[in-house]
């Protein structure tokens, strides 16, 4: 699917059933039985197969074979690892934990932002506040130097609280503000007259959609002993990733499916607590 069409994808006709099993959360666009159709199994093509591997040795257990010089991922392993990862995610959220979602792939920026807006709009604030996210650029030291970074996040949220609506209404554009907004908008928000910092110093788990581009984040998480869930393609190194999900992490359909699955988990938890 062309990246220009990503912005057209929205959450539509999502079936909500609070009694569903949290390991098999289904929607009307569930692709759990259609991974091949979604391109989840497609790995990377090696330029010189005789000289370089098109798959990383740490992904050998998820490797099904090679066809037309392209590695093929075992989708049964994908489904197994996905169930395990979302079970861990559900248990952490159900016990009041915090989750950090990271997807810095620029092609998925619009899709990721729209997904979070949908989740925020359709869930209680208390439930959504357990989620923090980064979809633009991971700033090194955000976790290990949280004391300093949190001051910048607070200043951004405070400015948004005072001037955000005014700037938007009068079409006033600050280049620096827009750049900071892309980096920090998922770390804090305004609830009434109070400021809520959704990013805690130490999240209980980090969900990374493109771990290959966020190696520094994985190092920070390992240093702080934070478990990491990662969508790993066949060329990814799984070292430092606690719960790898072997897949094609550039698949639009699979990425959208993960966001829908996350929404179903959060809705299940919010319904359970009522």
UniProtKB/Swiss-Prot annotation:
Which GO terms of the molecular function aspect are on file?
structural constituent of ribosome
Q: Which residues form the signal peptide?
A: none
Chief location of this protein within or outside the cell: mitochondrion
Is Ribonucleoprotein tagged as a keyword?
yes
PROSITE patterns tied to this protein: RIBOSOMAL_S2_2 (PS00963)
Q: Does the keyword Glycosyltransferase apply?
A: no
**In this record, what's one Pfam family?**
Ribosomal_S2
Q: Name one GO cellular component term.
A: mitochondrial small ribosomal subunit
* Tree of life domain: Eukaryota
Localization recorded for this chain is: Mitochondrion
In the record, biological process GO terms are:
translation
Q: Which UniProt keywords apply?
A: Mitochondrion, Ribonucleoprotein, Ribosomal protein
As for family, the record states: Belongs to the universal ribosomal protein uS2 family.
UniProt cross-references to HAMAP family, sorted A to Z? Ribosomal_uS2_B
**Name of this chain's protein:** Small ribosomal subunit protein uS2m
Annotated organism of origin: Prototheca wickerhamii
């Amino acid at each position: 699917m062309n990246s220009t069409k990503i912005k057209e994808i929205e959450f539509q006709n999502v079936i909500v059933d609070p009694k569903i099993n949290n390991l098999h959360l289904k929607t009307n666009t569930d692709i759990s039985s259609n991974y091949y159709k979604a391109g989840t199994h497609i790995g990377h093509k090696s330029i010189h197969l005789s000289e370089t591997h098109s798959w990383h040795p740490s992904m050998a257990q998820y490797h099904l074979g090679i066809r037309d010089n392209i590695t093929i991922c075992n989708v049964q392993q994908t489904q197994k690892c996905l169930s395990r990862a979302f079970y861990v995610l559900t248990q952490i959220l159900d016990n009041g934990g915090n989750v950090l979602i990271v997807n810095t792939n620029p092609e998925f920026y619009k899709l990721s932002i729209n997904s979070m807006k949908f989740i925020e709009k359709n869930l209680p604030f208390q439930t959504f506040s357990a989620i923090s996210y980064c979809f633009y650029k991971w700033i090194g030291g955000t976790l290990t130097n949280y004391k300093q970074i949190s001051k910048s996040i607070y200043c951004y949220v405070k400015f948004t609280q005072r001037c955000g609506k005014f700037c938007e209404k009068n079409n006033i554009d600050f280049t620096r503000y827009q750049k900071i907004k892309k980096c920090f908008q998922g770390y804090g928000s305004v609830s009434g007259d109070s400021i809520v910092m959704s990013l805690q110093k130490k999240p209980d788990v980090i969900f990374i959609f493109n771990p290959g581009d966020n190696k520094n984040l994985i190092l920070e998480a390992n240093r702080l002993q934070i478990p990491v869930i990662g969508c790993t393609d066949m060329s990814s190194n799984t070292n430092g990733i606690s719960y790898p999900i072997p897949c094609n992490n550039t698949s639009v359909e699979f990425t959208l499916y993960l966001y829908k699955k996350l929404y179903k988990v959060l809705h299940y938890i919010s319904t359970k607590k009522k």
